[in-house]
């Protein structure tokens, strides 16, 4: 396995660990999720370019579009939660609290 793939995989694992460990604030969760999407995008792009998949040339662009949509929804949720509650804690997202 080349060093490039190992580095990208480690970036994905570090982002995943950050998502699992620092999940109290919504902003840190969104940043870790963006890091995961960026590492997936780079891994998919390198794989498509190295293996010359002609049918999968659009896959990195489609993944990038989904990442942009996810970022827009996440930031709108962050603005809504911070305007409503004053903080960006993830525990404020639970609407079933009694």
From Swiss-Prot:
GO terms for biological process: ATP synthesis coupled electron transport. Its main location: mitochondrion. GO terms for cellular component: mitochondrial inner membrane; respiratory chain complex I. It is found in: Mitochondrion inner membrane. It holds the Pfam family Oxidored_q2. Its EC number is 7.1.1.2. InterPro entries: NADH_UbQ_OxRdtase_chain4L/K, NUOK/Mnh_C1-like. Keywords: Electron transport, Membrane, Mitochondrion, Mitochondrion inner membrane, NAD, Respiratory chain, Translocase, Transmembrane, Transmembrane helix, Transport, Ubiquinone. One of its GO terms (molecular function) is NADH dehydrogenase (ubiquinone) activity. It is a multi-pass membrane protein. It catalyses: a ubiquinone + NADH + 5 H(+)(in) = a ubiquinol + NAD(+) + 4 H(+)(out). It comes from the Eukaryota. The chain crosses the membrane at residues 1-21, 29-49, 61-81. The keyword NAD applies. Belongs to the complex I subunit 4L family. Core subunit of the mitochondrial membrane respiratory chain NADH dehydrogenase (Complex I) which catalyzes electron transfer from NADH through the respiratory chain, using ubiquinone as an electron acceptor. Part of the enzyme membrane arm which is embedded in the lipid bilayer and involved in proton translocation. Core subunit of respiratory chain NADH dehydrogenase (Complex I) which is composed of 45 different subunits. This is NADH-ubiquinone oxidoreductase chain 4L. It comes from Ursus americanus. The lineage of its organism: Eukaryota, Metazoa, Chordata, Craniata, Vertebrata.
